Amino acid sequence: ACNSTDPAAAQGAVAARPQVLSLPAQVGQLAFFDKRLSGGGNMSCASCHDPQYAYGPPNSISVQLGSDIAQTGARAVPSLRYRESTPAYDDNAPNPDGVTSESPGGGFMWDGRAATMAAQAALPLLNPVEMNAASKEAVVKAVREGGYAALFQQAFGARVFDDTDQAFDALGKAIQALETEDLSFHPYSSKYDLYVFNKIGGVLTPAERRGEVLFHSSGVANCSGCHYTGANFNGNTGLMSDFTYQALAAPRNDRSIPHNPDPIPAHDDPTYFD
């Protein structure tokens, strides 16, 4: 079979070939499922970002419990898929459509404060309402005493544990390597992806084709104005995002609203959130 010239057989052989991850990504894979990194020894990254649920939560709870089960997180847990192309935060992020003005965009966490996936991965570890590790030292100690300490040293140097900050940063880089290299984090396997890449199974129905036209129509729905689908924007392939932040809440209750019966002038009251 290895010498077969049948394209289908060759394609099957390629698909069956196991994915080879770099040493840092192998470390990241083990760390991703390591509950010992949490304060209670009961929670891993995968507890909230379950691979079986597209790296999202494995339950219907809107806000997940933390390692300290008396605590809950502050926001709904997002999927970790398709994060590898997200740029660092910028107050004036460029808009790919070339028309819309620049606006805040990029970064990780709800406010973009983590510039990279490596920086983002470190934040839940020390968050008291998430993994609740006591300190960087506690996390590094758990790695050093774990079953993959030797692999960690192979990936990041024999003396990596000599410096706590260096080892903690390396752990974030390992998880970033996993999320970048492991194709399950960005499979591009939906019907629309198959359609975009002209692959088997990617034939749209007439209704779906009409929906695509509507989605891209600037004069009607203009969904693509924010959900950009152009190829190779920051290295991504049609993620339907321009990575910017949008204000989708109710309009501000101020004097700019015509006939507002009870306006609250912006900035006049220190308790007013603008």
Question: Model segments located where?
Answer:
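Short secondary-structure boundary segments
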Residues: 29-35, 173-175, 182
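Proline-centered turn/helix-capping motifs that create local helix->coil transitions or kinks
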Residues: 182-188
